[in-house]
Amino acid sequence: EKEICEMIDFKYFKAEGYVPDKRYTLKEKIVELRKILGVASLENLTSFNHLVSYRNTREFTTKSIVNSNIMLELASKKARDTTTTKLNRKKLEKSLPALRELTRQDPEVFPQRLHDILLDCGVVLVGLPALPNANLNGATKKFGNGSALLLLTDRNKVSDIFWFSLFHEIGHILENDFSSDDENGELYRRSEERADQFAKDFLIRPEDYQAFVEKGNFDKSDILRFAEEIDIHPSVVLGRLQNEGILSFDRFRELKENYYFVS
């Protein structure tokens, strides 16, 4: 347990108010962490949770699995009894256009609206500050009562990554895809690719994107005009062009907003 405790950044729990801000011995840290996470032993955190779909940014290591599981546990505790509404995928699908419209709304306004629309469909949205070494952008999990958790961490939460991560996770939920398999890299990759493709095509319709790219004009004014036409946040267009290598990542940074999304 000591080795596991040393993989965990205890400062996070002080900063987020889970424990009083004082000095702790290793032994005390272990006791506190067991309490916070509701586990008999921290060793329970080392196993990959197959009932969860993770969007991670690097390969899984024991350290990242431990820290990802902690984030998941913290999010689950927050979300567990929020609603008895069962996940309704049809309703979620019908709500997609309303969710997409939020990309152009003020960051002060959209989080509540986003939370409400999802809750109405049986999805509890939780935003958590990223725990160091968790390498986690988001995750989804189904609760015993039929509702679902959608966790987003504030890791790299620039506006384009935020919306992409959100719709990636919604893609998993719509596919009823709530499991990851670290043993079977091929399956995991396919399920991630499906969710990525869903997010891409939903945020910018393939035919619209194709037509825009074929014109070959990628000035700031072109990006703003196209974003206006298809009614999406300009950073989503910019992020797509950057990810596909059409523009470099240092261009037009001013089109991206930083969101601090913690619920």
Task: For the regions a language model picked out, list residue spans one by one.
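Active-site hotspot residues in diverse enzymes, especially metal/ion-binding acidic/histidine motifs
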Residues: 1-263
